[in-house]
Amino acid sequence: MQDHKITLFHANWSFCSQMVRVALFELNIKFDERHIKLCDQYAEGENLDKNFLDINPLATVPVIKINNEVIVNSTTIIEELNKRFQSNLCIEEDDSVKSFVKQTTITEGDKFASTIGTIIPVFSAPLIEFMIRKLPLKSIIKIIMKHPRKDRKMIFLSMYFFGVAKKFPNLAIKKFADELIKFEKLLNEDNTYFYNEFSHIDINMMCVFNRLEDLKLSEVITTNKTPLLQRYWKNLQKRDSYKKGILNYYTSKEHKVIKDFYNDAPSPFLKPILVELAKRN
């Protein structure tokens, strides 16, 4: 019986929010939720409001409250949920497992586009810029005045005024091809998931693959270079948590943004990635 009050502060389309929601559904944890309209997607910019900054002064999601305790960072949240609810979701987390978990999420302080997890935001940057440039000026002023992080403030302002993100993905194409091949070689054809049992790494990779779908890049895991990745993704899509924690949180807004941005065309970065993959052994 669950005797903790769990409240999740999250955003529908947030990469790391998706990870935590999947974990909550995998662990069968009941939770209240509060959707935060992020400043890079919505005019309201609720993550910059005082009531949210009082909860997380960094203005990021996801945040979870367990009773009155606040926990931030998706990896930390999932690890804490795993410990407190006596699950084996993360398996025995030795150093190698922790390293893989770190590589498959957005980790503060990691080198730019250095892992598969930190490459995803680079590929997402043009889409984020598309949303930011549709915001009213008053929302940009709110970012200038209230965003607590100078780095994010400068990125958002550069996107809004100068459209700097259009070519960001070019910086990560070769490394991304390397990362895909690396993960292909790490997979075991006898396992259903990364290991045989579903784990924290699988949560992160589920979100990585789903974001590739959003970015019109999913074809990169359907080549003859990545047969195990393709099978792995199909297995992840069969989990109930994929629908409950990710697909069910898409609204007409997210679908419209994708449609308007790509205009039913493939990603301009798809072919360069496929070319790089073809070069790999």
Q: Model-flagged regions — what are they?
A:
Residues 1-147, 272-281:
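GST-like domain detector, emphasizing the conserved glutathione-binding G-site
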Residues 82, 208-209, 246:
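Active-site-flanking alpha-helical
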